[in-house]
Design a protein with these regions (language model features):
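Extended, charge-rich low-complexity interaction segments
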Residues: 134-151, 320-338, 381-389, 393-406, ...
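N-terminal glycine-rich phosphate/adenylate-binding segment common to multiple enzyme folds
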Residues: 2-7, 11, 16-21, 90, ...
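Structural motif
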Residues: 87-91, 141-142, 160, 240-247, ...
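Glycine-rich phosphate/diphosphate-binding loops that line cofactor/substrate pockets in enzymes
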Residues: 70-82, 173-182, 207, 217-236, ...
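Short helix-loop-beta junction
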Residues: 101-109, 256-266, 289-297, 345-347, ...
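Metallocofactor- and cofactor-centric catalytic cores in central/energy metabolism, strongly enriched
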Residues: 2-133, 139-141, 146, 447
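Peripheral docking tails and interdomain loops at the edges
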Residues: 2-45, 161-162, 175-178, 191, ...
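Redox- and metal-dependent alpha/beta enzyme cores, enriched for Fe-S-associated oxidoreductases
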Residues: 253, 335-435, 442-449
Length: 526
């Protein structure tokens, strides 16, 4: 319904379908051979790109890391910034001084290095940058999780894309993963059931080491040029994911392994089982180099909006369709564990682009679900101990313990609207739950133990992985927003809905578009 206060012309225009592209308008159309002002504003001027001194300074940074220095200099000059805050995760802080020196040398701005810990894109600290007097900040190493129009300061996101050896990556996949789906399950997955039945502590001997076989010479000759599969064989289905630094490499990998009958070199690229190397026994026929699978794979790059295709966070990962395995490109396990939790039945592999090793990764889903369910049940017991009427918040010796609702203050980790949604949920519960808001930048067992015995349960809005990974270390239940909804009966728990032999699915959708937790950050309701 149109606003009656608007003039008729405005009301009429409001009924017209909206254009999909909305940009700056020009009084006259641009002539051929000229660029619009909008395009020029976003292009890096040639004098910056060809600045010999600037290019020499950039050489002080690793060439395989894209810090987008030219773009940064352009934006600092364009915004006439006088003080620029630089926020980098700990893994990139070794380059902070060089970047700051370049900015101060080639612009009129001062650079401030924001040294507080940065765990992810949710930790962008525009509030501190403003308090320091900055009029612009550059956030490195993470995607634009907090939109630029919501920050309190002009913000430039630099993903820091990292170049990888795409040829080695593709050949490693082709050496270790048969492109024939049946052969993939027989040689990789089915043997895991046999290995899992070996008693703990039994000496299995050298003959029991992992050995993934490629196509034999006879098979290669029969099937043509080392493809290792018949034309009618179903291809192995792989889901490819990574952090934002390697999403471009995912696209290249998909192109490389979905091509049919590619020419590949017989270059070994060994597989590590659970991060333990397995050496060759030397009993291979003729000690010939292993053959690779040169056939076509079926590769998908899943997406959980608003993230980029293939990008996953420690708290947000998509549910996968029918795939035989997932391949994670990146170092460490934090992000990988997110998609493993969301897809407990999908075998997971990790390719580390730094060590160039491929490992089979596992996660104890049963233990995680049990530990988190115990926290929820303990929280429910504290609710059952409350009086049916609204309890008083006035402290006295017989007062029931409160729930502490923690608003994370490390960057943008905590959302005040989400805090409102949670407190409204507690107040409107069948048994109203007394609570007290708590502001904390970082949580620790010793810090929360100081609130004993007045608080029976903590709810934290900082990061779901704090509860999943470290909840067992706290004296009192430390619930995420999702677990809180389960505890008060507003959401179906992972233990309530059985989905296969391993139980229900624990969702990893904290920032996924349309999830209750994403909606609460925008509307203060679930």
């Amino acid at each position: 319904m149109a606003d009656e206060s608007k003039p008729p012309s405005a009301t009429a225009n409001a009924k017209k379908p909206r254009k999909r592209f909305i940009g700056s308008k020009s009084a006259t159309p641009s002539k051929p051979g000229t660029s619009s002002s909008t395009i020029i504003a976003h292009q890096i001027p040639e004098d910056i790109l060809s600045d010999a001194l600037l290019n020499d300074a950039i050489k002080q940074l690793p060439s395989n890391y894209s810090f987008e220095i030219h773009k940064t200099i352009h934006h600092v000059r364009k915004n006439a910034a006088t003080m620029v805050g630089l926020q980098l995760p700990e893994g990139l802080q070794m380059f902070a001084c060089v970047i700051a020196d370049i900015i101060e040398r080639f612009t009129n701005a001062l650079a401030v290095i924001m040294g507080d810990v940065t765990y992810g894109a949710c930790c962008i600290d525009d509030y501190t940058a403003v308090a320091l007097g900055c009029d612009m900040m550059v956030h490195y190493g993470h995607s634009c999780l907090v939109p630029m129009d919501q920050t309190k300061i002009k913000t430039l996101y630099v993903f820091v894309e990292i170049a990888v050896d795409s040829n080695h990556l593709a050949q490693t996949i082709r050496l270790n993963f048969p492109n024939n789906r049946q052969r993939f399950h027989e040689s990789l997955l089915d043997s895991e059931e046999t290995d899992s039945q070996i008693p703990t502590g039994q000496i299995i001997g050298k003959s029991r080491h992992l050995r993934i076989e490629a196509a034999s010479a006879e098979e290669s000759a029969a099937h043509g040029n080392g493809t290792g599969s018949t034309p009618s064989a179903e291809p192995t289905r792989l889901a490819l994911v990574s952090t934002i630094q390697f999403v471009a490499a995912l696209q290249q990998l998909k192109e490389d392994i979905t091509a049919e009958d590619v020419a590949v070199a017989n270059r070994p690229a060994g597989l590590l089982e659970d991060s333990v190397a397995h050496e060759s026994t030397g009993n291979e026929v003729g000690n010939s180099p292993p053959l690779v699978w040169s056939g076509k794979y079926e590769a998908t790059i899943p997406r959980s909006k608003p993230l980029s295709p293939g990008e996953i966070l420690g708290c947000t990962a998509p549910r996968l369709g029918d795939v035989d395995a997932l391949v994670y490109l990146g170092d460490g396990r934090f992000h990988l564990e997110s998609i493993m939790i969301a897809n407990p039945t999908v075998p997971a592999f990790r390719y580390d682009p730094y060590s160039k090793k491929l490992t089979r990764e596992r996660y104890d889903h049963g233990e995680m679900r049990t530990v988190r369910d115990q926290a929820v049940q303990t929280a429910r017991q504290s609710i059952e101990a409350l009086p049916a009427s609204r309890p008083s918040l006035v402290a006295h010796k017989d007062a029931p313990p409160l729930w502490g609702v923690i608003l994370g203050t490390l960057g943008r980790q905590g959302s005040f609207r989400q805090l409102q949604a949670i407190t409204n949920q507690l107040s409107s519960s069948r048994t109203p739950i007394p609570f007290i808001p708590i502001l904390l930048s970082e949580l620790s067992p010793s810090k929360l133990a100081l609130f004993n015995p007045h608080i029976s349960t903590f709810v934290q809005t900082s990061c779901p992985r704090l509860s999943i990974d470290w909840g067992y270390a706290f004296d009192k239940p430390l619930l995420s927003p999702y677990e809180t909804a389960v505890a008060v009966g507003k959401a179906v728990g992972w233990m309530d809905k059985q989905d296969g032999a391993e139980g229900g699915i624990y969702p990893m959708d904290f920032y996924a578009a349309g999830s209750p937790w994403a909606i609460s950050r925008a509307k203060a309701v679930f």
